[in-house]
Amino acid sequence: MKLPFIFLITLLIFVSSCTSILINESSDEERTYSFSPTTSPFDPRSLNQELKIGRIGYCFDCARACMRRGKYIRTCSFERKLCRCSISGIK
């Protein structure tokens, strides 16, 4: 009974010490990130296009939600994530 218990405790100590060594080594590394506009894959035009698509998609979903309620769309603000429908219904 004592032998499996001692083996288990020894194994846990070994695993925990290896884990702490690996964590310390990975946190001690210095990570430097450089930004060079000439080599960067970042394209502001594509980001702008994605934002336009997101805005159109959000307002489209807003309009669909208002129409499901039988109302007109009153306000759609992508930046504030605001979607308001009109008070009066569709005639």
UniProtKB/Swiss-Prot annotation:
Disulfide bonds join C59-C76, C62-C83, C66-C85. Residues 68-88 are annotated as: PRK6 binding. InterPro entries: DEFL_AtLURE1-like. The keyword Disulfide bond applies. Keywords: Disulfide bond, Glycoprotein, Secreted, Signal. One of its GO terms (biological process) is pollen tube guidance. Its main location: secreted. It comes from the Eukaryota. One of its GO terms (cellular component) is extracellular region. Residues 1-20 form the signal peptide. Glycans are attached at N24. It is found in: Secreted. Expressed in the pistil. Detected exclusively in the synergid cells. Belongs to the DEFL family. Pollen tube attractants guiding pollen tubes to the ovular micropyle. Attracts pollen tubes from both A.thaliana and A.lyrata. Binds to PRK6 LRRs. This is Protein LURE 1.3. It comes from Arabidopsis thaliana. The lineage of its organism: Eukaryota, Viridiplantae, Streptophyta, Embryophyta, Tracheophyta.
